[in-house]
A protein has these predicted regions:
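Active-site signature of alpha/beta-hydrolase-fold catalytic machinery across serine-
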Residues: 20, 123-127
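Acidic, low-complexity terminal tails and accessory targeting/binding regions
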Residues: 27, 32, 40-62, 91, ...
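Phosphate-coordination/substrate-recognition cap region in phosphate-metabolizing enzymes
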Residues: 1-71
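GST superfamily/GST-like fold recognition
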Residues: 118-122, 154
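Conserved nucleotide-sugar donor-interacting segment of glycosyltransferase catalytic cores
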Residues: 103-108, 117
Length: 183
């Protein structure tokens, strides 16, 4: 893998992921933190529609309940029916993600690595495909941890090349490493 520039969200886990990629791949591209790549707060999204405390989801039934609430909360946030505490509006969240894509198109010609999280990745994919916001909910809940989504871009637009791939974990010894939300 090679890249000429790196943008990550400002979250510790996103920066840590970049540091691991850089160390493992021997990369030294310039890195800039980009707040528009930050993840939404799933707890705040759920709390916006379900005000009582929830038990830790540690059974199949509680996992299903958690992801039903998350889907409903995301749909309400995206439609502007709720405003989760401490979060931007969905319009602003989406604008931050699109701003990162626009920044890449306007400032680079090739190989830019964006290190983010499921919500921004799904939002970017839905935007590039001109899909309705509801599609980003399902895209988000299918993203596998450490998955790669690849775009081609020119000064006018991005094009989706791959979504949710794990080329770095394709070998048999890594099969047990695959994880994702079971929503």
């Amino acid at each position: 893998m090679r890249c000429n520039a790196v943008r990550t969200g400002t979250l510790r886990r996103q920066i840590g992921t970049w540091q691991g990629i850089a160390e493992g791949g021997g990369l030294s591209a310039p890195h800039v933190s980009w707040p528009g790549l930050n993840e939404y707060d799933s707890h705040a999204v759920i709390a916006a529609i379900h005000h009582e405390p929830l038990p830790k989801p540690d059974t199949p039934e509680l996992y299903r309940h958690h992801f039903r609430l998350l889907r409903d909360g995301l749909a309400a946030w995206m439609a502007g029916r709720v405003q989760p505490a401490g979060m931007p509006s969905y319009v602003d969240f989406r604008a931050g993600v699109i701003g990162a894509l626009d920044h890449v198109r306007q400032n680079f010609e090739n190989e830019v690595l964006l290190v983010s999280s499921g919500g921004p990745i799904a939002t970017a994919v839905a935007h590039v495909l001109d899909a309705p916001f509801e599609a980003s909910i399902e895209l988000n809940l299918r993203i596998r941890n450490t998955a790669v989504t690849e775009y081609a871009f020119n000064p006018k637009r991005h094009q989706l090349i791959t979504y949710n791939t794990l080329p770095h974990l394709d070998a048999p010894p890594y099969r047990d490493w695959l994880t994702h939300a079971r929503g």
